């Protein structure tokens, strides 16, 4: 998927050896103002990196440090994300497996309120009769009904290249994203990859969408009611109204993939020109 177009000049980027978790954290830090975290294998290094960078005074693309809030559990971290988004702060979290399942109640609220969050997930087996820390997609598949869009990557370079698409499409499309990749096989695989410069990430950011999101935040100067009770005469109509955003989302995702392609000379996209396509959702072994 990340082949290079011959007719596009590739932008020069710094190279660095890192794993998929670090690549996701690098992009997430750029677009995040608040991170609600709780550690769980194999996603913990993402939250740890963001916490370390914040403590060191690193700035995001908005010129501020990320405020990191560690809670008592993943359920608390998801509640932090929901509350922070409601007050107009771009908020992210990092999790996997049972940790992601604990976030599902808040995910319904975040998606239902059309709040632009990104959950970075290093996908891991959901524990059943026994604990298992290795990779499958049972955790992210359990979230399909929540209303979150899903974007997947297969290696650390794709994590670096495509994570911005999740953040930017969430902002413009008003649909939250799960950005996921295989636990351990991608999250902990160290490769020499090309990394984004924050100035390039800032250039792609739709500041008008950021401003619209902040204006929609809870504010005592212009109070609004949220989370109210609705009867059946209006609940269904209001719930269906968000379908327009989901119908428009593929075009928004493709728009930002094209922006990435313009900068990198890559050929990321949602559709293939081939007439017969086999699809897999896993890390690459070659």
Feature locations, PLM:
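Conserved small/polar residues in nucleotide/adenosyl-binding loops
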Residues: 273-281, 285
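Conformationally flexible catalytic loops at phosphate/diphosphate-handling active centers
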Residues: 62, 66, 177-270
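Hydrophobic alpha-helical scaffolding
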Residues: 14, 18, 36, 71, ...
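Generic recognition of stable, solvent-exposed alpha-helical segments in well-folded globular domains
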Residues: 45, 158-161, 251, 255
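Thiamine diphosphate
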Residues: 2-142, 147, 164, 183-184
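Structured core elements
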Residues: 36, 178-180, 282
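Generic recognition of flexible, low-complexity loop/linker segments
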Residues: 23-25, 267-272
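Conserved thiamine diphosphate
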Residues: 133-183, 195, 207
């Amino acid at each position: 998927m990340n082949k290079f177009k011959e007719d596009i000049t590739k932008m020069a980027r710094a190279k660095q050896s890192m794993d998929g978790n670090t690549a996701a954290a690098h992009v997430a830090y750029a677009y995040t103002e608040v991170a609600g975290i709780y550690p769980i294998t194999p996603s913990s290094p993402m939250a740890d990196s963001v916490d370390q960078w914040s403590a060191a005074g690193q700035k995001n693309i908005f010129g501020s440090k990320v405020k990191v809030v560690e809670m008592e559990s993943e359920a608390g971290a998801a509640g932090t994300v929901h509350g922070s988004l409601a007050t107009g702060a771009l908020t992210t979290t990092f999790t996997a497996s049972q940790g992601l399942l604990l976030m599902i109640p808040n995910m319904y609220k975040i998606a239902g309120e059309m709040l632009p969050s990104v959950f970075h997930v290093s996908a891991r087996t959901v524990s059943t009769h026994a604990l298992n820390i290795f990779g499958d997609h049972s955790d992210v598949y359990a979230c399909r009904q929540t209303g979150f869009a899903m974007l997947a990557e297969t290696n650390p370079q794709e994590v670096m290249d495509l994570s911005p698409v999740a953040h930017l499409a969430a902002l413009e499309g008003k649909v939250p994203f799960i950005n996921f990749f295989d636990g351990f096989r991608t999250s902990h695989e160290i490769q020499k990859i090309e990394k984004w410069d924050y100035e390039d990430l800032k250039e792609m950011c739709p500041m008008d969408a950021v401003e619209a999101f902040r204006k929609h935040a809870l504010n005592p100067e212009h109070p609004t009611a949220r989370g109210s009770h609705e009867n059946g005469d209006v609940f269904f109509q209001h719930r269906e109204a968000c379908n327009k955003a989901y119908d428009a989302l593929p075009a928004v995702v493709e728009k930002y993939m094209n922006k990435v392609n313009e900068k990198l000379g890559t050929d990321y996209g949602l559709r293939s020109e081939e007439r017969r396509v086999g699809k897999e959702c896993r890390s690459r072994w070659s």
